[in-house]
Amino acid sequence: MILYYINKILSNNKVQAFILWIIGLAIVIVLISYNIDDPSFNSVTTEYPSNLIGIAGAYLSDFLYQFFGLTAFIIPLACFVWGRNCWHERYRSVFIRIFVVLLALISSSTLLSKIKLEFIPASAGGAVGIIVSNFCERFINQLYLLFQTFVILVVLLEIKLISISNVLIKLSKFLTNLILSFFNYIFPRLSLITIQNNDKLNITSFYQKPASKKVTFTEEASLIPTNPIKCFIKPVCTKISQNKIAALPPISLLCDPKNNHVKGASSSELKQKAEELLTVLNDFGVKGHIININQGPVVTQYEFEPAAGTKTSRVVGLSDDIARSLSALSTRIAVIPGKNVLGIELPNKQREFFCLKELIETPEYQDKSILLPLVLGKDLAGKPLIADLARMPHLLVAGTTGSGKSVGINAMIVSLLYRYTPEECRFIMIDPKMLELSAYDGIPHLLTPVVTEPSKAVIALKWAVKEMENRYRMMSNIGVKNIAGYNEKILEAVKENRVIERPIQTGFDPETGKPIYETVTMNMAKLPYIVVIVDEMADLMLVSGKDIEMLIQRLAQMARAAGIHIIMATQRPSVDVITGVIKANFPSRISFKVTSKIDSRTILGEQGSEQLLGMGDMLFMGNTSKISRVHGPFVNEAEITKITEYLKETSMPVYISEVTEQPEENYSSIDIVDGSIDEVLYKKAVQIVRNERKASISYIQRSLRIGYNKAANLVEKMEKDGIVSPPNHTGKREILLPEM
């Protein structure tokens, strides 16, 4: 019975940590209080040893110094690290730990073997160092041994080089602030220079209040974002009202995080839950053990390593049985990429809710390397997850009613509104349901009012395709590959007060037949990003599925470099809505809770979405096909109303009518140069029609030896000028010009 209680006490990880720390502290005391005159294996004396641990400490210190020298301090250091790992329940094989420590002792003592010290019997590396050093001088390079020692020490301490760099950065910040505070005390009129936690150097005047540590957004409408270019390239870019200047919305419009953080389960409760989970798995004949536990804001992930020979499909198929046995709402089981474990996700007893403001204030959102930040939420470890729409480059979202899909889309839109002004990012919002996106109607970021008719949605997508082609021609003229390179060249030209010119063909020389070129000055304005948001894809596919599918495919394949991106959502992820063509062109997808495993496989390619908890619980698959579980933030309607009203007050929307209007003429972009047709070619076509009394497109095509599109444009121009009549029911045209 006594042995049972002793074993139970020693199995506690906290007790193990204290024992290791006490052993490490005792060894440090033994080594520090070492005296060469104390009794040892090599000397005998009648005096009482001066070692603080007594006779045992004297013999132990003599043994360690003789064999390992100064590297004996690695042993207590290892005890401290192991104790920390036991305290935080980071388990690793004992044999691996002992093996690593022995390697560190041998390699370190070898490096110090050539150093002689008076208070140590042998060298600084001990007897082991001398023996191994003699061997290494013959067979192993000393430089390689130094590298090996460094690697072993890093593995032993289980630290990361990033952690070391963070410590050095914080230390340098502290010393810098200390020195600057000293000079500021002596010279109070100097500017206050403070290094903030977001690794940016903010310089503020002495008479100004320092900025907040987290928020970098403007708090007043009078503050104007620094943007040297305020004009747009036609037809996308339009002038904004001069009496109202667009500004980023203040962070104060969002609700503050509530101090109602749910206290997570204790370590003992998690271990008890893990034991219950192992018992349930054993009941179903699945053997294995749990190697790690990750507690998140909504669910807790148990990393289960099955026994050899256990099929993954067998464990995944037990998700419903595990949920029933543990009285849980649902259980999701999936393979963790890069590990030989299965992640078993169980919901927490109490769910933690968080708002959008908490994530927008994080350094991850303020990272300027993320071009189009989308706030998705927190991962299983509670860390913010900010995705970059520019790298996706398009996003497909699916989820049933009440799963949090609309709130997630609102969070994405708001995260873009807090980053870019209307000069930098524009939206085309398509909402056939006339409910979700109507709140954003009237904001200056829109290219057109929120589109609610499916027929106009097709026209808007066609306009996006034309705008994409126009941008590609503009980028090709100045020799860049994407919108970032184009804007960079434009900014450089504006700073240098020069214009960018390009040659265009205006016709042919009637005598030589060679093309005639003229130099045209390009519009020196930046190209804004364009984000097309489709809230319900199913309604559009019912009305005009083929046209929508073709346009979406064209944009998804080519619009990335032009700065045009798509966020497409649907609450019915069936194969007739998310077709194979659409699915192949949207590598980045988000699945909220769905009704069946079939819908989950349709959107993600695997099951698991049907096991989600709803209310913002989602599965995110990036363009690397790695699926991660994310918990979305909450955005209420009051916050959206405040943001949209603020944007409407600071700037008036300037719409582009061509986005939703069917063009009267459909000239090919190849045949049109600055809105005109080759007059010489047009006169030849009119002369042929007058003389031959034939006005068919094919006849003009053969006579002038031109393409079909160019011939069709010439005939349509004749119809507009009154030379030929519109085609009748048989397609024939009447020639209105008299005969020569």
Curated annotation (Swiss-Prot):
Segments in the Cytoplasmic topological domain: 188-740
GO cellular component, one term: plasma membrane
Keywords, comma-separated and alphabetical: ATP-binding, Cell cycle, Cell division, Cell inner membrane, Cell membrane, Chromosome partition, DNA-binding, Membrane, Nucleotide-binding, Transmembrane, Transmembrane helix
Domain named FtsK: residues: 382-601
GO biological process, one term: cell division
Localization per record: Cell inner membrane
Main localization, broad class: membrane
One of the record's GO molecular function terms: DNA binding
InterPro entries given in the database record: AAA+_ATPase, FtsK/SpoIIIE/SftA, FtsK_4TM, FtsK_alpha, FtsK_dom, Ftsk_gamma, P-loop_NTPase, WH-like_DNA-bd_sf
Residues where ATP binds: G402, S403, G404, K405, S406, V407
Transmembrane region(s): 16-36, 63-83, 93-113, 115-135, 144-164, 167-187
Membrane topology qualifier: Multi-pass membrane protein
Subunit details: Homohexamer. Forms a ring that surrounds DNA.
Family the entry assigns: Belongs to the FtsK/SpoIIIE/SftA family.
Entry-linked PANTHER family: DNA TRANSLOCASE FTSK, SPORULATION PROTEIN RELATED
Domains (record comment): Consists of an N-terminal domain, which is sufficient for the localization to the septal ring and is required for cell division, followed by a linker domain, and a C-terminal domain, which forms the translocation motor involved in chromosome segregation. The C-terminal domain can be further subdivided into alpha, beta and gamma subdomains. The alpha and beta subdomains multimerise to produce a hexameric ring, contain the nucleotide binding motif and form the DNA pump.
Function in brief: Essential cell division protein that coordinates cell division and chromosome segregation. The N-terminus is involved in assembly of the cell-division machinery. The C-terminus functions as a DNA motor that moves dsDNA in an ATP-dependent manner towards the dif recombination site, which is located within the replication terminus region. Translocation stops specifically at Xer-dif sites, where FtsK interacts with the Xer recombinase, allowing activation of chromosome unlinking by recombination. FtsK orienting polar sequences (KOPS) guide the direction of DNA translocation.
Protein name as it appears in the record: DNA translocase FtsK
Source organism of the structure: Rickettsia typhi (strain ATCC VR-144 / Wilmington)
